[in-house]
């Protein structure tokens, strides 16, 4: 056991439906407190040399208003084009930081109950389009864009509010939270890999879905994306005008078992393009007959429900 994180969360707000398609969620205040417990010596030694590991076990106090808007017309099954949109804004520590004159860059870091509170603005949008191709076929696509900016009492976004990419519901050809930031290579430690996190996120997915027989449905997909930092000492981690060159790309196939009360999903993905290195496109290296290639590149995902 490396560490434990105790998380306490509370919120007060309003949820209302404008109509069957539109929903608003306004939390007047959303409070999150994260406290690390039982951090092992092994983990602490690694954290002393890898900042990404240290951020995981930092105490975090986050509070402030949040707002989320959701629109969907996907309930119209016979319609050729349907859409889903979810957008949100998180304003943490804004009023408190201004009232207390917090400015960590000027050496004025303010605390509440002995813990520095986070101050940031976070925006995220998730847009999906579903195109009905036939009675049993569909083309589904999604784009996710997210950005977070820390200021005032914070030098960086708190770990739990940063962005992650890769895994079962993301870029399925890469392991969960293993991509980025930017063109940086995965951090190597002697024992484990940290979750890769960033201040910016761009993800694109497209999936062709069809019924094979009875309750079994098939899918072919392509996923792409990455995360970036805004102001990291390591240049390759930061967002730049060359961000498209940092994109990880993967593809694969999957089966979905529609059991009426739930959908059991399996996906098998492999990378087409790495976000780092000199030779990033790896299509010419695909070799299904090579056991070594399969071990290093094939990623199996098991999940409940559709990825989007």
Q: Could you tell me what each predicted segment is?
A:
Residues 1-144, 305:
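Transmembrane beta-strand segments of outer-membrane beta-barrel domains in Gram-negative
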Residues 138-221, 228-231:
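Extracytoplasmic gating/loop element in the C-terminal half of outer-membrane beta-barrel translocons
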Residues 12, 257-261, 292-308:
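Outer-membrane beta-barrel "beta-signal"
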Residues 5-6, 20-26, 97-101, 151-163, ...:
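Outer-membrane beta-barrel and related beta-rich outer-membrane complex signature
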Residues 3-7, 56-62, 78-80, 114-122, ...:
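Transmembrane beta-barrel outer-membrane domains
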Residues 85-89, 127, 141-143, 206, ...:
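Membrane-embedded beta-strand positions of outer-membrane beta-barrel proteins
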Residues 50-56, 108-114, 189-194, 237-241, ...:
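Extracellular loop and loop/strand-boundary signature of outer-membrane beta-barrel proteins
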Residues 42-53, 99-109, 173-190, 231-236, ...:
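Flexible, solvent-exposed coil segments and beta strand-coil junctions
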């Amino acid at each position: 056991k490396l560490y434990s994180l105790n998380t306490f969360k509370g919120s007060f707000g309003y949820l209302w439906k404008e109509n069957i398609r539109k929903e608003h969620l306004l939390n007047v205040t959303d409070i999150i407190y994260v406290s690390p417990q039982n951090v092992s010596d092994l983990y602490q030694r690694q954290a002393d040399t890898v900042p990404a590991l240290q951020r995981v076990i930092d105490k975090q106090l986050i509070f402030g208003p949040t707002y989320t808007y959701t629109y969907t017309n996907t309930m119209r099954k016979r319609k050729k084009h349907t859409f889903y949109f979810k957008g949100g804004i998180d304003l943490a520590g804004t009023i408190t930081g201004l009232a207390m004159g917090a400015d960590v860059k000027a050496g004025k870091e303010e605390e509440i109950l002995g813990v520095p509170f986070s101050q940031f603005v976070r925006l995220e949008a998730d847009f999906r389009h579903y195109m009905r191709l036939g009675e049993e076929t569909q083309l589904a696509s999604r784009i996710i864009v997210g950005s977070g900016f820390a200021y005032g009492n914070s030098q960086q976004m708190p770990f739990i509010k940063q962005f992650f990419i890769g895994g079962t519901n993301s870029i399925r050809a890469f392991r969960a939270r293993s991509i980025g930031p930017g063109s940086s290579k995965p951090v190597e430690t002697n024992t484990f890999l940290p979750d890769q996190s960033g201040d910016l996120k761009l993800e694109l997915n497209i999936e062709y879905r069809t019924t094979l027989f009875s309750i079994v449905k098939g899918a072919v997909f392509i996923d792409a994306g990455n995360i970036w930092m805004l102001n990291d000492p390591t240049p390759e981690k930061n967002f730049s005008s060359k961000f498209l060159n940092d994109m990880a790309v993967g593809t694969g196939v999957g089966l979905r078992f529609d059991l009426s009360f739930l959908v059991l999903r399996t996906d098998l993905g492999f990378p087409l393009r790495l976000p780092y290195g000199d030779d990033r496109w790896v299509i010419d290296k695909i070799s299904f007959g090579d056991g070594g290639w399969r071990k290093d590149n094939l990623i199996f995902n098991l999940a409940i429900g559709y990825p989007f």
